[in-house]
Amino acid sequence: VQPNVKIYVEDLNPCGRKVILFLHGWPGSHKLFEYQFDQLSKMGYRCIGIDTRGFGYSDKPYDGYNYNRLSDDVRCVVNELGIKNFILAGHSTGGAIAIRYMARHKGHGVAKLALFAAAAPSLIKRPNFPYGSNKEDIINIIQGTYLDRPKMLRDFGDIFFFQHTTQPFSEWFLQLGFQAAGWATAEIAKMWIEEVLFNDLEEIRVPTLIIHGIHDKVVPFQLGEVQNQCIKNSRLVPFIFSGHGSFYDQKDDFNMELMRFIEE
């Protein structure tokens, strides 16, 4: 995507009849969507997962952690694979990157958009925006990253899901965060403070599915409601037994909702 910067892409079932391009959230990797790749590929879908720069198996440069560059990375992958009429699906920060892609790249190649607890239009509360997290909480994440990243990641994992997760699952989730670079982990958190996507939402023209857990402690449910109001052709589906990780909290419902939306 840039000189000396390679992005890792998982391309499962490349002969599938419809393409879903997944953008993961912070601080994980494409592996967060394991339970979607497992089932949706069997249903005939081509599932493509990108590891954001700095995370998963992608290269970990010291810069490029802003919505413009991250959406440009996605465009590079779309161009390289030559995919068209695909479903762009983003969770949390990945949802925010998807929204910037729709605005900055005019939704190039995208037939439909799916947002899961997207960190938009602003993850933090602002003078004219009363929803979202407190800025202090994000500053604590940044400081925690530089002070004791394993503990910060453990604390974050503890609020991620609403349903009970087993100890082995929690350890697996933690390992995904360990794959990221510390500097990338902090830079993305800084981006939440420095960047907003209010204007981007207005530019989305494609049918959009919004799945948001009502118990989300990371990206409050109200942000999903704001997205629903701002995106013209959108539908909000509240997940009443989910926190931030609806793709695992209610994985069967999640997969069914996503397939129904794709086939509409």
Regions found by a protein language model. Give the residues of each.
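Gly/Ala-rich beta-loop-alpha elbow adjacent to hydrolase catalytic centers
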Residues: 90, 94, 98
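Conserved alpha/beta-hydrolase "acid-adjacent" motif
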Residues: 217-223
